UniProtKB/Swiss-Prot annotation:
Lineage, uppermost ranks: Bacteria, Pseudomonadati, Pseudomonadota, Gammaproteobacteria, Pseudomonadales
Gene Ontology BP terms: positive regulation of translation
CDD domains attached to this UniProt entry: EF4_II (cd03699), EF4_III (cd16260), LepA (cd01890), lepA_C (cd03709)
Assigned keywords, A-Z: Cell inner membrane, Cell membrane, GTP-binding, Hydrolase, Membrane, Nucleotide-binding, Protein biosynthesis
Function: Required for accurate and efficient protein synthesis under certain stress conditions. May act as a fidelity factor of the translation reaction, by catalyzing a one-codon backward translocation of tRNAs on improperly translocated ribosomes. Back-translocation proceeds from a post-translocation (POST) complex to a pre-translocation (PRE) complex, thus giving elongation factor G a second chance to translocate the tRNAs correctly. Binds to ribosomes in a GTP-dependent manner.
Record has Membrane as a keyword: yes
Domain (tr-type G) ranges: 5-187
Organism of provenance: Pseudomonas aeruginosa (strain ATCC 15692 / DSM 22644 / CIP 104116 / JCM 14847 / LMG 12228 / 1C / PRS 101 / PAO1)
Name listed for the protein in its UniProt record: Elongation factor 4
Binding site for GTP: D17, H18, G19, K20, S21, T22, N134, K135, M136, D137
Length: 599
């Protein structure tokens, strides 16, 4: 099938839980990618974590052959993408490899913020967007209302949107038929020099680096010598092929196709995502526009529980960064926790997932410090610095102005829950920018401090709106704000890993809450442990974990008061001596207590 008119490349985009992966399952079933024995629900979500949480984290690609009603057999290359706001970069990467996108909308819930955001990304990249109404078998499906929403919120024509139910398989054939006609075929020259874009890479212990590529021009086959444009290194191709979802080797990959290339690259940084591959004998092929690097929004320190694991931890991070290009890290040391890494994540879910993947796939025990965002600091000498770690904050005397990141958040919420959502946004120091009333929902746009959004805003939003509100946010700008560093002292010593940067108005309240929380979590010692919260030199809250003590008077029956006093004084002196030399072990829960503090 060398003719490009038979190829269709498309992504499936949708909000969380609108049925992307189930629709992908139906496609695979109908086009015979797997036997019935191998078929399972969400067959593409191959990571244990994805299956447990029921979410897609990585974009997965599949090549299927579909015999359409016009008698032709089409090659469908499709990519199932994540729906969660933290993984938007996975979506934009997938879209770069496609000519079209299926916008899957739950006919009961209607359009949600994440589908809007992903849809705009697709339209910006010039893709043909085809709306599909899913879950039509549910009694609460309202196709007419949802079509209206698609037109009013996203602005694409939805009059003839295909209705289907991925679960029962109803209407899925119509989706495939419409797909073949609505989505354009790829453009490219098979005879031109090779030009291929790396969409994703991962590390296999046996094969080295496996890269998923979209071939724009030319062809690549086993034995070819390929050149990686950014590094200038040449590798020999060991095998090429496609996922049907099974790993299937083919003779070659041609223009317009999506598949994998294995070239025995051992160096983890040998094939960066977004890079261009070409053949060794045509080194002057121009570089394809890659993807814009995503900036991490949340930073946290990750430390191995035992310092012997440090090297393994570094290797694990390197391998994970290859697979997840938005993860950034740099070494850091903490007085309390020893050596570790400061890692940058796209959001809280991303951070949880990375920590779980490190603990599971690489068998590490980790301690995480409280996440913070990046602050912009203007110093008295006019220099601007960016701080992602509260303990690195310069002395307050040298700071002229502190600016915090503000993000533009778009929230879609049913009218009944609007009041609660607005109250929540005000509590989080939000400023309302816009409000549109749509058929059943309201779209509100707020400017919110990133610090408030990344920690627990999403969970609070879901609970205050009974799960109906949806959120999409993106970094907008830095804005001057009255911020202070809140330090936690344990027995008079600062614990650098527990420091926080908070708004001055919330600081005393936050300090009190944090201290109370820590009191519950730090186990009782043989001596009193004082927990204090301080801003600069001023202590704003304190509580004490009382000492455990033995009843030294148990052996005195009656007896002289001076005898009792002697024993008590002796105990007191011992406790005092202990307090001078004793150290307090802080459990992992205490570091995470910082997250649970309501502002």
């Amino acid at each position: 099938m060398s003719d490009l008119s038979h190829i269709r490349n498309f992504s499936i985009i949708a909000h969380i839980d609108h049925g992307k992966s189930t629709l992908a399952d139906r496609f695979i079933q109908m086009c015979g990618g797997l036997s019935d024995r191998e078929m399972e629900a969400q067959v593409l979500d191959s990571m244990d974590l994805e299956r447990e949480r029921g979410i897609t984290i990585k974009a997965h690609s599949v090549t299927l052959h579909y015999k359409a009603q016009d008698g032709k057999t089409y090659q469908l290359n499709f990519i199932d993408t994540p729906g969660h706001v933290d993984f938007t970069y996975e979506v934009s990467r997938s879209l770069a490899a496609c000519e079209g996108a299926l916008l899957v909308v739950d006919a009961g819930q209607g359009v949600e913020a994440q589908s809007v955001a992903n849809c705009y990304t697709a339209i910006e990249q010039g893709l043909e967007v085809m709306p599909v109404l899913n879950k039509m078998d549910l009694p609460q499906a309202e196709p007419e209302r949802v079509k209206e929403e698609i037109e009013s919120i996203i602005g694409i024509d939805a009059t003839d949107a295909v209705a289907c139910s991925a679960k029962s398989g109803m209407g899925v054939l119509e989706v495939l038929e419409r797909l073949v006609t609505a989505i354009p075929a790829p453009e490219g020259e098979i005879e031109a020099p090779l030009q291929a874009l790396i969409i994703d890479s991962w590390f296999d212990n046996y094969l080295g680096v496996v890269s998923l590529v979209r071939v724009k021009n030319g062809r690549v086959k086993k034995g070819d010598k390929i050149l990686v444009k950014s590094t200038g290194k040449v590798h020999q191709v060991d095998s090429v092929g496609v996922f049907t979802p099974k790993h299937t080797e083919t003779v070659d990959l041609k223009a317009g196709e999506v598949g994998f290339i294995i070239a025995g690259i051992k160096d983890i940084h040998g094939a960066p995502v977004g890079d261009t591959l070409t053949l060794n004998n045509t080194p002057d092929v121009e570089v394809l526009p890659g993807f814009k690097r995503v900036k991490p929004q949340v930073y946290a320190g990750l430390f191995p529980v035992s310092s012997d694991d440090f090297e393994d931890f570094r290797d694990a991070l390197q391998k994970l960064t290859l697979n997840d290009s938005s993860l950034q890290y740099e070494p850091e040391s903490s007085e309390a926790l020893g050596f570790g890494f400061r890692c940058g994540f796209l959001g809280m879910l991303h951070m949880e997932i990375i920590q779980e993947r490190l603990e599971r796939e690489y068998d590490l025990d980790l301690i995480t410090t409280a996440p913070t965002v990046v602050f912009e600091i203007v110093q008295k000498n006019g220099e601007i610095i960016y701080v992602d770690n509260p303990s690195k904050l310069p002395d307050l005397a040298s700071i002229q102005e502190m600016r915090e990141p503000i993000c533009r958040a778009t929230i879609l919420v049913p009218k009944d829950h609007l009041g609660n959502v607005i109250t929540l946004c005000i509590e989080k120091r939000g400023v309302q920018r816009d409000m549109h009333f749509l058929s059943g929902q309201v779209q509100v746009v707020y400017d919110l401090p990133m610090n408030e959004v990344v920690l627990d805003f999403f969970d609070r939003l879901k609970s205050t709106s009974r799960g109906y509100a949806s959120l999409d946010y993106s970094f907008d700008r830095f804005e001057p704000s009255n911020l202070v560093r809140l330090d936690v002292l344990i027995n008079g010593e600062k614990v650098d890993a527990l420091a926080l940067i908070v708004h001055r108005d919330n600081a005393p309240y936050k300090g009190r809450q944090l201290v109370e929380k820590m009191k519950e979590l730090i186990p009782r010692q043989m001596f009193d442990v004082a927990i204090q919260a301080a801003i600069g030199g001023q202590i704003i809250a304190r509580s004490t974990v009382k000492a455990l003590r033995k009843n030294v008077l148990a052996k005195c029956y009656g007896g002289d008061v001076s005898r009792k006093r002697k024993l008590l004084e002796k105990q007191k002196a011992g406790k005092k001596r202990m307090k001078q030399v004793g150290s307090v072990e802080i459990p992992q829960e205490a570091f995470l207590a910082v997250l649970k503090v309501d502002s």
